[in-house]
Design a protein with these regions (language model features):
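A short beta-strand-loop structural module common to alpha/beta enzyme folds
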Residues: 20-30
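Acidic beta-strand-to-loop metal/phosphate-binding motif
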Residues: 61-67
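Short Gly/aromatic-enriched secondary-structure transition segments
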Residues: 10-17
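Divalent-metal-activated hydrolytic enzyme cores
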Residues: 1-9, 28-42, 52-61, 72-129
Length: 129
């Protein structure tokens, strides 16, 4: 949702997935929402929008993003990374046939893949600005 992360993330994803366009499904603190799954209405809304992206737009991958100074998830980096990892696990249950990655946008607005992103897959771009 935060405009400060949109362009760096879109640029990263265009390069990472070798695509011209990126669908954006935005919520404040999506990593925490999908990790905790306590707000079923919002989780369902996110999944409905991701379904459109994957099924109708034939998206090549899904990225879940956390970032520095997030108002929707004011947790520290370590906890947000844990939320990202849990969110990835949750999304992989719904989308097992598509690549799902977690990204952390730091205080300098650099996009970084989180550790353990692609178990068994080669790391494409560790950092992008």
């Amino acid at each position: 949702m935060d405009g400060r992360v949109q362009l760096p993330v879109i640029g990263f994803l265009k390069k990472y997935f070798s695509v011209h366009y990126v669908d954006v499904v935005s919520e404040p603190g999506p990593n925490r929402i999908l990790a905790e799954q306590s707000d079923s209405k919002t989780v369902k809304s996110i999944l409905n929008r991701v379904n459109i992206s994957v099924q109708k737009h034939r998206s090549k991958g899904i990225a879940i993003v956390g970032h520095y100074d997030c108002a929707g998830n004011p947790s520290d980096k370590s906890e947000q990374i844990s939320h990202l990892q849990a969110a990835i696990s949750f999304l992989r249950k719904h989308y097992s046939e598509i690549e799902i990655i977690g990204l952390w946008v730091d205080e300098n607005w650099y996009v970084n893949e989180i550790p353990g992103n692609n178990i068994g897959r080669p790391l494409k771009n560790a950092q992008f600005c």
